[in-house]
Amino acid sequence: MKEQALITPRTLSGFKDRLPQEAMAKSRLLRTVSEVFEGFGFVPIETPHLEYAEILVKQGSDEIQKELYRFFDHGGRDVALRFDQTVPLARFISQHRNALGLPFKRYAIGNVFRGERAQRGRYREFTQCDFDFIGSESIGSDAEIIQVIYASLKALGIERFTISMNNRKILNGICDYFGVKEQTSDVLRIIDKLDKIGEESVIKELVEELGLSQESARGILGFTSLKQERSSEEFFAKVASYEGLSDSLREGMGEMRALYAILDTLEMDRACYKINFSIARGLGYYTGIVYETTLDALPSIGSVCSGGRYDNLTQSFSKERMSGVGASIGVDRLLAALEELGLLEGRGTSAQVLVACMEESQLAYSYKVAERLRTLGIKSEVYPEAVKPKRSLAYANSKGHPYVAVIGEDELKQGVVTLKDMQWGDQKPCISIEAAAEILLG
């Protein structure tokens, strides 16, 4: 019989496995931000990975639609994998409107899919962690989303970051002034590439793709290059002369002033949030304030949290107008950044202690010790074989167990354990399980 050829184990480009250490780091990150969300009153929901294509296609930009994983299923239905969690949220809200009270604050954590070029910090399957405030037109809800971004990054131990903010109404207004109102979506799509391709390439695309004059292209880019360098008061004074250019621009600037009236009263570091008129957000459903968050130490990795207001998102599903504002944390990109910054804990186990014995006759007692420790609130793992301490300690060291509870003949007879601190090498011989638990909880 011909020997069957072995399959080479491999993953697709842009898709990845996670070894325990990385998977645990991701789990800790998600637990941390979930606690922040719930501290603001957000509740979890879940939506399917697979949606009818028509639900996703209408709301995504042209660029997003090119990256969509779309196919016909076995039943001949035109379906697609979700590219974000905001469009499924619009469908969810419209479908379950009667079961939800408004305003509704939700968060959702799950994988999304985009067929973009894979590179550092960018994957084709990646986890998004979204939080949204539905049913409120108040600028206060915009301010709260920004507050949640700030609190989440601080909870993860990140001190220096910048939340760059803009308003689509301001961008719409400047496009109107330069006579390209009908091409606003295309103009914003190209401006959104500014950090990726640079000023001259943006001007070239505006001129060659959209037919703008050099004067209009440079005028739009000149305005979008304005950034807040110092206090908000100085910046608003600097751009006040632009407000007369259009009603939309004036309205957008008024909203930014109202936003700052709230943000500046909070105990947030003002260096962490600034206005940047080049922030456009490529997704077509944003209608008001938009923002992107970059890490000051790693700006090249891109935005780790972005979002904005989308007052018309449910219009494809319902005649009822539904306001919303939210943001999305790019979990995989943020994990890559945290690793590069040395902020990820390096343990490969969740257990606080490894229980290990030296003789087969002591194995049952090992499981009893671990059971008792768990009832006392200690995450405990049992080494499943009787081995010499050198071997069990090497295992604990490789996995990152902080402590090892060693069981030998004396420990079995007395109903105690010997507790070894793996970091400092200290050892507490023959102490009670309760005493060991106190040290472990310590």
From Swiss-Prot:
Q: Which domain of life is it from?
A: Bacteria
Compartment list: Cytoplasm
Q: Name one GO biological process term.
A: histidyl-tRNA aminoacylation
Reactions the enzyme catalyzes: tRNA(His) + L-histidine + ATP = L-histidyl-tRNA(His) + AMP + diphosphate + H(+)
Please tell me which top-level EC class this enzyme sits in.
ligase
GO cellular component, alphabetical, reads: cytoplasm
What Gene3D superfamilies does this protein map onto? Anticodon-binding domain, Bira Bifunctional Protein, Domain 2
Does the keyword ATP-binding feature in the UniProt annotation? yes
Keyword tags: Aminoacyl-tRNA synthetase, ATP-binding, Cytoplasm, Ligase, Nucleotide-binding, Protein biosynthesis
Q: CDD domains recorded for this chain?
A: HisRS-like_core, HisRS_anticodon
Question: Can you state the subunit structure given in the record?
Answer: Homodimer.
Q: What is this protein called?
A: Histidine--tRNA ligase
- Native source organism of the sequence: Wolinella succinogenes (strain ATCC 29543 / DSM 1740 / CCUG 13145 / JCM 31913 / LMG 7466 / NCTC 11488 / FDC 602W) (Vibrio succinogenes)
User: Encoded by which gene?
Assistant: hisS
